[in-house]
Regions:
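Outer-membrane beta-barrel porins/channels
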Residues: 1-219
Length: 219
């Protein structure tokens, strides 16, 4: 068999762990049969997510006659995210050639982004009027995957555990994400030193989100 791309690696893991067999010896064969007899199989899926979105801002501000406040931010974003999944399938049919399968798939995503923010507050006696604009957030993201699989089978009277761990990190072409801009307006009334009343309205059209296809692949 020839192994290319993400899809081919899935076939490689399945074949080397005896979960699947090709229907012929043709090296270009793409049809397989399963060596697992499905009945009342029990499935477990453990998922662990962790990561962060860090934003570093460079701030500029100004004040005009203690009436008009202006602010401007330049933001640099950093994203690191790990999705770690462990899938287990057990309690196969007694006639199954393969049983107790464990598949680990780790997705690592990281990248950097950029955005701008502008805001102003107008002070009129006890009234405060605010307006802010958040530019779109542009990101370039990289994805990597690491996979391994294990299974059990019998060879005569002997139980054999197959551990297939290529120790390969699959890397994919970067892709771009754009999170749409947001506009906010606010009103506040200050009751001297006794309190205040405020209201804020924000608008963001998420249908303008963008995901490029530069990194499109079978995964």
């Amino acid at each position: 068999m020839l192994f290319r791309s993400y899809g081919a690696q899935q076939a490689f893991l399945g074949y080397q762990s005896y979960i699947i067999d090709p229907i012929s010896n043709n090296p270009y064969e793409q049809s397989y049969i399963s060596n697992i007899e499905s009945s009342q199989n029990r499935h477990y899926l453990n998922v662990i997510n962790n990561g962060f979105h860090r934003k570093t801002s460079f701030n500029f501000s100004g004040l005009y006659e203690n009436i008009l406040h202006l602010g401007f931010n330049i933001n640099q974003h950093r994203i690191d995210f790990i999705n770690d999944q462990e899938f287990f399938e057990g309690e196969q049919d007694l006639n199954s050639l393969i049983y107790d399968v464990s598949f680990d798939n780790k997705l690592i995503s990281y990248g950097e982004g950029f955005s701008l923010q502008f805001g102003t507050i107008l002070k009129l006696n006890n009234i405060r009027l605010g307006l802010s604009y958040d530019s779109p957030q542009w990101f370039e993201i990289n994805d990597e995957t690491i996979q391994k699989i294990s299974s059990y089978r019998y060879d005569g009277e002997f139980e054999i555990k197959e551990n297939i761990n290529p120790e390969i990190t699959n890397t994919y072409r970067p892709y771009n994400i754009k999170i749409p801009s947001k506009v906010s307006a606010s009103f506040a009334y200050v009751f001297n030193e006794r309190g205040l009343f405020s209201i804020e309205y924000s608008s963001q059209n998420l249908s303008n989100s963008y995901l490029s296809d530069n990194g499109a692949s079978s995964y």
